[in-house]
Amino acid sequence: MEGAEGSDSCDGIQVLLSREVIDAAPQCPHGPTLLFVKVSQGKEQGRRFYACSACRDRKDCHFFQWEDDKVSQARLAAREEYNKSHQPPMTHAQYVGRFQEFTELPLAKRKFCSDCQQLLLPTNWESHSGHRVLGDISLSQLKRPSQLLHPLENKKANAQYLFAERSCTFLMDTIIALGFRRVLCVGTPRLHELIKLRACEGATPPIKSLLLDIDFRYSQFYWEEEFCHYNMFNHHFFGGEAAKMVCQKFLQEEDGKGALLVTDPPFGGLVEPLAFSFKRLREMWKTTNPENESNLPILWMFPYFFESRILQCFPDFTMLDYQVDYDNHALYKHGKTGRKQSPVRIFTDLPPDKIVLPAIEGYRFCSVCERFVCSGNKHCNICNCCTSKDGRPWKHCTQCNKCVKPSWTHCSACNHCALPDHPCGTAGRGCFLCGGKDHKRRGCPHQSVSAHGKRMENLKQKNIKGSMKKQPIAATSKKRKRKRNNP
């Protein structure tokens, strides 16, 4: 992965984003779909198409529609019915009612089905008799649902790599130190739990939290004012206007003062749709005071090799050196060394010198850069900054005039630094949009833009590209059969 991190290589699929496009998009079970197009040499090639916003693999969501398709009323009705059948079996209000009834049961009657991931009332016991069932569910366990629920681990859609206690505590301490009193937790259930546990203990200062997450299972444990079923890739509230108003009311309390957005999206997700949704959440926060020039602050957890993409969406963001670690990820854990360290960092528009990283973990303050850096991040006097991205000491290359990874060497044939065993030559270099050799696609002056002048994100996705290729004749009958069964 070291040779590919931060690469501009792509397969020519881009996503077009604007409110008008999303409002007009057909819906799949995950809400409005996104509009994609294949681009080559700066021009659109072929037809635009709609695909699921949350699932990049069509095995997870098979929705596909050409933009110019004429969809019959019968097919629209079948699609609507299909989407409804793939929604949670109960409304949030019904889940809340079940939760109240569950908490009133004696300890011996509180059961949880591990197979179905569901709290069981006595009337449900018989239908789950052959399943793996946990008994004696305590009230303290109900306050930590992320430890009861199995994490969803599809990294391209709804991956749940849950914060380790170390990182969760650091975030909590930072929130308190910076004076925030309301936290919008977008895809961060562990942090939401910690904030609520702290509130139950009567800790001061009091902090409130609202969880937005695509995992509807949390509806079983939280009131409607504490959780909203939400897709962060298309800004879709599954609970409709009522859920949207819950979020807006939360953000606008005390005229929006003391609010913070903390998010931890799936690492396989597209950056620009995420940024588009976060900007819309900012707009919800700003509604009460449109004249306010400030923005809702954001802490965004994402791998460091997406830095350039995030900065293109949020130029005022800074990447912190803090390494975020997770309980249920084999590699993203604290204490590992070299390239085994977690690549997940915090991107934020908050002043980096105000976010104090723990000295006990080796972080120190660089007075020149005016931010905290990890022990391996040495200040380069030539670059005039602490240049390391991955925690290892980087070295300065005078020919490239920048710092590079310690394992890289300068290649005179390619005229840049790379891994020693890299393939030499000019293949793959330059811009695939216009063919220019002096820049990459992301810096192309002929870049295609959306209706609002925003840069369109390139979709690094082989699955969609593969799905557009012609299939062998032997598979044609199966495809037609699937098309009849799946609206």
Curated annotation (Swiss-Prot):
GO biological process: positive regulation of translation; rRNA methylation
Record: residues binding S-adenosyl-L-methionine: Q160, Y161, L162, F163, R190, D213, N231, M232, D264
Binding site for Zn(2+) 5: C397, C400, H410, C417
Segments of skewed composition (Basic residues): 477-487
Top enzyme class: transferase
Intracellular or extracellular location(s): Cytoplasm; Nucleus, Nucleolus
Chain spans, region Disordered: 445-487
Positions of Zn(2+) 4 binding: C380, C383, H396, C403
Zinc finger CCHC-type: from-to: 429-446
One Pfam family per UniProt: N6-adenineMlase
Primary localization: cytoplasm
GO CC entries: cytoplasm; nucleolus
Binding locations of Zn(2+) 6: C411, C414, H422, C424
Binding site residues for Zn(2+) 1: C28, H30, C52, C61
InterPro entries in the cross-refs: DNA_methylase_N6_adenine_CS, Mlase_EEF1AKMT1/ZCCHC4, ZCCHC4, Znf_GRF
Entry binding sites for Zn(2+) 2: C113, C116, H128, H131
E.C. number(s) listed in UniProt: 2.1.1.-
Record: residues binding Zn(2+) 3: C366, C369, H379, C386
Segments of this protein annotated with the region Regulatory loop: 323-343
Reaction catalyzed: adenosine(4220) in 28S rRNA + S-adenosyl-L-methionine = N(6)-methyladenosine(4220) in 28S rRNA + S-adenosyl-L-homocysteine + H(+)
Keywords: Cytoplasm, Metal-binding, Methyltransferase, Nucleus, S-adenosyl-L-methionine, Transferase, Zinc, Zinc-finger
Biological function: rRNA N6-methyltransferase that specifically methylates the adenine in position 4220 of 28S rRNA. N6-methylation of adenine(4220) in 28S rRNA is required for translation.
Family affiliation: Belongs to the ZCCHC4 family.
Domain notes: The regulatory loop blocks the catalytic center by bridging the methyltransferase domain and the C-terminal CCHC-type zinc finger, resulting in an autoinhibitory conformation.
Protein name: rRNA N(6)-adenosine-methyltransferase ZCCHC4
Organism of derivation: Xenopus tropicalis (Western clawed frog)
Gene that produces this protein: zcchc4
